[in-house]
Amino acid sequence: MKVRAILNPRAGLGARRALEDVRRGRPSWRDLEVKLTTGPGDAQRLAREAAAANADLVLAVGGDGTVNEAARGLLGSGVPLGIVPAGSGNGLARALGIPLSPARALRALEGALVRRIDVGTVNGVPFLNVAGVGFDALVGWAFHRAGRNGGRRGVLTYVRLSLALVRSYEPVPLRVEAGGEEFAARPFLVAFANGPQYGGGAVINPGARLDDGRFELVLYDDRPLLAILASAPRLFLGGIERVRGYRRIPTTRAVVTLERPLEHHRDGEPEPAALRLEIALLPRALPLLVPRTTAEDPSGPFTPPA
């Protein structure tokens, strides 16, 4: 099997160990080539080149940003993507039940099945798991800047930044068109969720299916600071959908028009400010390598066979 591994050496936790594990390879991956990224856009380019060179499988070794880029390079090629988590959030890997240890992830993927997942787009740019605008995007930008300036990455940094920013955060009024509804709102955040969770294990869209031909537009209303802080543990402990102010709308398309331009994110990666966000879906557009236990779990993130 011809395998190309695309590794971001700056992805964060576990990247160096992942490089060693991937180089060692698995018995069924005799023809394994490792390519290192050096900057934004490299993973997408390397994945596209791998598909053009008739690779049988591309492995994205890194965080959610590396996975997103590699997937963009493979869209339309039919070449499946495997995820070896080596970042700080690893949202999609967690949703797929892929072990966070690179060595264990490689073992799990060796006997994995191929499942096709839906791919969302924000203003035409793909995301796989969760995109959004509002407080989560603000924290994502701060997290990105902290990492770029040499700060520590990881869930604790994300929590620290969230606590620092939440006190002064002012939501922006916006207008939503989704699921046959149109309404004005001033939410704390709006998430466009194809998958169930952010990186770090924070579940924003419980019960999500990655292949059901729709995404969920999730709104969390602006509430008093203490109420927001009190509800935050629900993201990790379960039950966020029962929190007052939480609402989700299943849809295949949405438009969010903001009162003023605001930054957003795709799979945790910061995107520049925009006044209008158009979200759409590409049904089952990406073949993905999924651990067998997850692929066959009727309560997992894939639609059970009829």
Regions found by a protein language model. Give the residues of each.
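Short Gly/Thr/Asp-enriched flexible loops that form oxyanion-binding sites at enzyme active sites
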Residues: 66-77
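Gly/Ser/Thr-rich active-site loops/lids in small-molecule metabolic enzymes
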Residues: 147-156, 198-201, 206-227
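Glycine-rich beta-strand-to-loop/alpha-helix junction loops that act as flexible
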Residues: 9, 61-63, 84-86, 194
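ATP/NTP phosphate-donor binding region
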Residues: 1-58, 68, 295-306
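Glycine-rich phosphate/pyrophosphate-binding beta-alpha loops
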Residues: 132, 136, 191-204, 270
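ATP/nucleoside-binding phosphotransfer catalytic cores, i.e., glycine-rich phosphate-binding loops
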Residues: 5, 178-179, 184, 209, ...
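Catalytic core of DAGKc-family lipid kinases
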Residues: 6-7, 37, 75-80, 86-188
